[in-house]
């Protein structure tokens, strides 16, 4: 029973960290990366789909993405979607290939992104701590119902605390890496 609760809590903590990783990927660092366009959706035969599902998205160089829609009719739709998105880039279209130069980030914009990254990291830490709290409550209920001893309760709480510390440490490392990449010019 303890192992089931621990495994569930550990899985949920890991998912929280993975979610943070995907959120960090959406924060632009000034370098070209295909995941920048993940949030951009286009209307494709009546359904909203990510740009990556209607076009090839590649990195041409450190500051340029290329987008090549698979259908000629999608060029203007994709271009409009990219321009109206809030990622702050403007595609340059030549034929059916769009080049998207990544403007260098201003100091102010970098600080905004760092603030956003810190906020995301803090929300993830809170989620991890809430998972720990829930697991500890489950352990205490088992102890109250005499399904586990006081020693087993203490061991379970130590085990969940150790997992919490590991996941929070991962979040801190990811945040430090993201801050470093945002401050690179």
UniProtKB/Swiss-Prot annotation:
Location within or outside the cell: Cytoplasm
The record's GO molecular-function terms, alphabetically, read:
ribosomal large subunit binding
Claim: Protein biosynthesis is one of the keywords in the record: yes
UniProt keyword annotation of Protein biosynthesis present: yes
Superkingdom, natural source: Bacteria
Q: What is its main location?
A: cytoplasm
InterPro entries in the record: Ribosome_recyc_fac, Ribosome_recyc_fac_dom, RRF_sf
Keyword annotations for this protein? Cytoplasm, Protein biosynthesis
Q: Name one GO cellular component term.
A: cytosol
UniProt-listed GO biological process terms: cytoplasmic translational termination
Family (UniProt)? Belongs to the RRF family.
Role according to the record: Responsible for the release of ribosomes from messenger RNA at the termination of protein biosynthesis. May increase the efficiency of translation by recycling ribosomes from one round of translation to another.
Name of this chain's protein: Ribosome-recycling factor
The organism named in the record is Hydrogenovibrio crunogenus (strain DSM 25203 / XCL-2)
Per the UniProt record, the lineage of the source organism begins with: Bacteria, Pseudomonadati, Pseudomonadota, Gammaproteobacteria, Thiotrichales
The gene from which this protein is expressed is frr
């Amino acid at each position: 029973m303890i192992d089931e609760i621990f495994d569930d809590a550990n899985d949920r903590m890991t998912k929280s960290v993975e979610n943070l990783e995907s959120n960090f990927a959406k924060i632009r660092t000034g370098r070209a990366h295909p995941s920048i366009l993940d949030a951009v959706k286009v209307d494709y035969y009546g359904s909203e789909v990510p740009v990556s599902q209607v076009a090839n998205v590649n990195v041409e160089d450190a500051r340029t993405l290329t987008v090549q829609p698979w259908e000629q009719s999608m060029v203007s739709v994709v271009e409009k979607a990219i321009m109206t998105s809030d990622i702050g880039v403007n595609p340059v279209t030549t034929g059916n290939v769009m080049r998207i130069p990544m403007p260098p980030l201003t100091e102010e914009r970098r600080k905004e992104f760092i603030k956003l990254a810190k906020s995301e990291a803090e929300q993830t830490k809170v989620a991890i701590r809430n998972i720990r709290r829930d697991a500890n409550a489950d352990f205490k209920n088992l102890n109250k119902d005499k399904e586990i001893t006081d020693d087993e309760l203490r061991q379970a709480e130590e085990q969940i605390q150790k997992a919490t510390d590991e996941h929070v440490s991962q979040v801190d490392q990811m945040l430090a890496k993201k801050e470093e990449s945002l401050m690179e010019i």
